[in-house]
Design a protein with these regions (language model features):
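Intrinsically disordered, low-complexity segments enriched in serine, threonine, and glycine
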Residues: 132-229
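Short, acidic/charged, Gly/Pro-enriched secondary-structure junctions
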Residues: 65-106
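Short, solvent-exposed beta-alpha or beta-beta edge segments that form flexible loop/patches at the rim
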Residues: 24-60
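Solvent-exposed loop and beta-edge segments used for protein-protein assembly and interaction
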Residues: 54-58, 83-85, 113-115, 168-170, ...
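Mixed-charge, glycine-accented linear interaction segment located at domain edges/termini
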Residues: 5-11, 124-126, 204-209
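Short beta-strand and beta-hairpin "edge-sheet" elements
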Residues: 27, 90-129
Length: 229
């Protein structure tokens, strides 16, 4: 039975809630415009303020039916409210199992008749959803062959090697984890890192292919969150 994983709880497996509707709003772009006298339209400064379009949060609205013993509804509602109401949670839809959302959840309303209770949970989530296993091992049971690819992020370098990192829609800075010193060339700029963990904020992974030239001898992992709208 399809449901939603909220934190460590699955809405059907743990609570026997029947998911009847999922509503997802589209995140509104944060635009910046100025009126200029004598100019048609407006001056759009949105992309000039940062290296990517920024978005407001989106809303996930999840509607469930309760069909278990009516005498347990109050007890179950108390359990659900204590577990998630007002809390920031990770949300994974069974229909989109390769990604997770992050946001704050509330119980919006509950109504009932003699046979069925209806529960609405709303989650104010970040605009991007993120791949569950970006930068690490991926699992067959969450892998979606239609919408996802297998991306290599761990490398053994012996000399100089060109590697390609495939990023999603959100522009982001990666973290490098290595067991030896390396020289990294990206976008015409050379960076030198020592063994250990280092996030390089000046490196901005663009959507699609990002090519690096790596020099050194050892193991290198590139970690980042691959965000999709």
């Amino acid at each position: 039975m399809l449901g939603v994983k909220i934190g460590n709880i699955h809405t059907y497996d743990d609570w026997k809630l029947i998911l009847t509707k999922v509503e997802k709003s589209f995140p509104e772009p944060k635009t910046e415009t100025q009126e200029v006298p004598g100019m048609n339209g407006v001056l759009d400064l949105t992309e000039s303020l940062s290296d990517d379009i920024k978005y407001k949060n989106r809303m996930l609205t999840l509607t469930f039916n309760m069909i278990n013993n009516r005498t347990r509804w109050d007890t179950l509602l108390t359990e659900i409210e204590n577990y998630l109401h007002g809390k920031k949670m990770q949300i994974i839809l069974d229909s989109d199992k390769f990604y997770y959302y992050e946001g704050r959840c509330i119980i919006d309303k509950f109504s009932s008749n003699k046979a069925i209770g209806t529960l609405v949970i709303k989650c104010d989530v970040s605009p991007y959803k993120y791949e569950l296993d970006t930068g690490g091992a991926w699992l067959w049971d969450t892998f979606n062959f239609r919408n996802s690819d297998i991306y290599k992020t761990k490398f053994t370098i012996d000399g100089t090697q060109q590697i390609t990192i495939v990023n999603g829609r959100e522009i982001t800075s990666p973290t490098f984890v290595c067991d030896a010193p390396f020289t990294i060339k990206f976008g015409g700029v050379v960076y030198k890192i020592e063994a250990g963990t280092r996030k390089i904020l000046d490196i901005r992974l663009q959507e699609g292919n990002n090519d690096f030239i790596i020099s050194g001898h050892g193991n290198l992992e590139i970690r980042f969150r691959r965000g999709m709208l």
